[in-house]
Amino acid sequence: MLHCQHEIPLHIVYDEEAYVAKITWIKKRDGRVETYRAEKIAAAVRGAFGDAGEVPQEGTLEQVVELVEAALAEAAPASAPAESRAVSVEDIQDEVERALMRLGSFETAKRYILYRHRRTELREVRSELAGAVAEDPQGAAALEAELLRVERDFPEPVYAVSHLATRYHALTAPGQTADARMSALIRAAVELTSQEAPRWEMIAGRLLSLRFHRALAARRASLGVESFSRLVAYLTNEGLYGSYILDAYTPEELEKAAACIDPARNDLFTYAGLDLLLQRYVIRSHAGEPLESPQEMFLGIALHLAMNEGRSERLAWVERFYDMLSRLEVTMATPTMSNARKPDHQLSSCFIDTVPDSLIGIYRSIDNFAQVSKYGGGMGMYLGKVRATGGSIRGFEGVAGGVIRWIRVINDTAVAVDQLGMRQGAVAVYLDAWHRDLPEFLQLRTNNGDDRMKAHDVFPAVCYPDLFWRMAEESLDQDWYLMCPHDILAIKGYALEDSYGEEWERRYLDCVADPRIPKRAVLLKDLVRLILKSAAETGTPFAFMRDTVNRVNPNPRAGVIYCSNLCTEIAQNTSAIEEVSQEVVTSEGDTVVVTTTRPGDFVVCNLASLSLGRLAVEDDTEMGRVIETAVRALDNVIDLNFYALPYAKLTNHRYRSIGLGVSGYHHMLAWRGIAWESEEHLSFANEVFERIAFHAIAASERLAEERGAYELFEGSDWQTGAYFAKRGYVDGADAGAGVAPAAG
């Protein structure tokens, strides 16, 4: 096959006076007139020589081009009007054949003739397929142009449009609508996707993009929306965009921002990725019709994230945020992608609440979860303080229902509060490995047993102390003692869950030795068997190593880390919300009940993910640029966020925690041919993640210099330098050197 995109060597020079003045335009097969480019002839001829297994002698390409131009110039005298000197593609190709034969390159001429024949066949397949799918000439022309792009970008025989046509005809029947036919064409591309031909998924994505953008253009034309600034105004009037965007940016600024949009980046989507984005994330009318394109979605998010930047540099940050998103280098958290630019702009993904051991506190935590879920957040809930089954209530022994009953209420809340039908609520429930309800907890999602003790829509997670695994390693035939946290607090005067490490072990063994505390002895091997059985059947429980996490807590003076979030990725101090008082107050003739609460630490984390498969991870400068942009966007989320709960806002501003994760890890390795089970993998991963950590911390430090350190910086491991010492990043001489990050 010829490769017409190649350029001829720069030393080839044409006599402009003799030829170019006479051949100025070329008429394409679809009637379009383009500027004549002699180098395209040379590139096609070079390709023909290559197909024939020959290398053209020096000067041959120039001779062919000169012969072609001379013949064409003779056919169109210089005195003729410019439009009549526009020669057709077919005329040029005919003259190329004659020129090759005049020069004695018969095998090359034969290859060139075969090439023309193949191109004719491909054109016929494209034209026939486009005509069969589309309902009007404009639609057929647009589809044929897209199929031509597919041929050029995917030249391998396995991606021939003829394969698509064959599969399409097998999926269609007479009488189908144009939309159904286009759906069948997209489905045909999806079904052609295989291990041997994986890029059909990219082709399917392009076809889906074509259908979506044509429908969107028609819809917008009917609404009279012709520019991005008018689109923002229309969406704002409809209550689909937050008015804060128009308050922050002038129409002129919006149009300048819109100039950043690069439609070519739609080609980066796979079918599955684009379909998900169109279904979940682009703004739709109240009737469910899409009103913005994927690139406009990325720009809208960028505009929101850059709102509070200084006016002189704000649009520059808009462009940087747009670039990292539209190039798919960084993916913001689902709520940010979904809610940024909208009236209810809850941008954070993950929240953690500590459930207190009181009826009011438990229901407050469940209500908190409902509010978080309503706006797209996921939740981690620590139930380690809730008394176990058979515990006492107000001195009455054996009446407590335990944590399972409350988890079932949490489960039903997750199902009921489904984020406007977008997706079911998501929650992880955490319990300590020494809690008396642990055996039942481990069977929450298994398929056998009493269904009244099941909760299939939550994600159980266990908080393990080091002692548990140390004893398991020593001997699985030892007893492990399960206890009720309420009993321990009532008898010993301390909450066992409030400690970790050596202090926890000392207290745990003290409780085991105290005969006043009821205990449930379970063989370690039976407990481990339950854990493995549940993991094999359900993929849960998640594992959270509390001692390890608390040892490296950068804010140890501010509290204890009880658990993590839905994804087991956040490690941050948590504490329960406490009710202080409730009083009846009469003011100006209106009687109200005022409840006063102490907020505790209601953890919020603001997340983004580096797409390692799309980043040049070896390029330190490029990684630094992308990471700095992502960290700044995440820090902006904290201030721009809509908070459904005041507790969340207080904690988020106190700690300013951000989470920069990764995706596309296996993709990164596959691109580089790095085997999973290899030393090269380990050393490469270490290098990549050290680079990510370095640039993230450096970006946070620069933000602290610009905006100030977070509230709890004084006395933190960041301030003392212990953060780096605990991780082995400094020698003894540097252990006291601190850094002031914007986030804790």
Regions found by a protein language model. Give the residues of each.
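Extended catalytic cores of very large enzyme megasubunits
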Residues: 2-4, 11-744
